[in-house]
Amino acid sequence: MMKGRNKNAGHRLKDCHFSKEEQESLVKMFKELTKDNTGSIREDKLDRSQFREVLHSIFKMTDDVIMDRVLRAFVKDHEACINLYEWLTGLSVFLKGSLEEKIQFCFKVYDLNSDGFISREEMFHLLKTSMVKQPTEEDPEEGIKDLVEIIIKKMDLDHDGKLSFKDFSDSVNVEPLLLECFGTCLPEQKVIDSFMVMFAVPTP
């Protein structure tokens, strides 16, 4: 099924937000990234280390846990590599997604064990990796636990002690700033603008 999708990526995909020209440029970029040292395409997939380098060098992401989860949010199966179709549709949400698409994306990133919920343990783990420890803090873990409880109180709308997708979606729709409350998993707008300007079609 994926092979068919890869073939179709040469045409403009209907399920992404890029123009034909932008999509063609992203296809070229993907092919460049998947070349080996001899200049030939060794495989039509981006592996984990290649994708992490893209996230770090182009999109300025630094959190190891979040970067691995972003990879998982891009792929449609359980592989640790990204094919061309996933590259295009993933970047479509990553760079130009609607709020609803970004809510789905971020929830998938934060749901570390993919069970359909963000548990207290997952919240703690995500916040612990994303927060910078201050030298004056005696026990930063206690502060993180307190923050988890504040978030639970605010976002756990059905009061079951964890966040379902509905809890997360409803909370973010009311207060969009909660979208990345467990760590930055989308690039800043200025980074997106700098990236997209490379694909801008010159005006005559």
Predicted stretch roles:
Residues 12, 50-51, 66-73, 84-88, ...:
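EF-hand and EF-hand-like helix-loop-helix modules
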Residues 1-75, 82-110, 120, 148, ...:
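EF-hand Ca2+-binding helix-loop-helix modules
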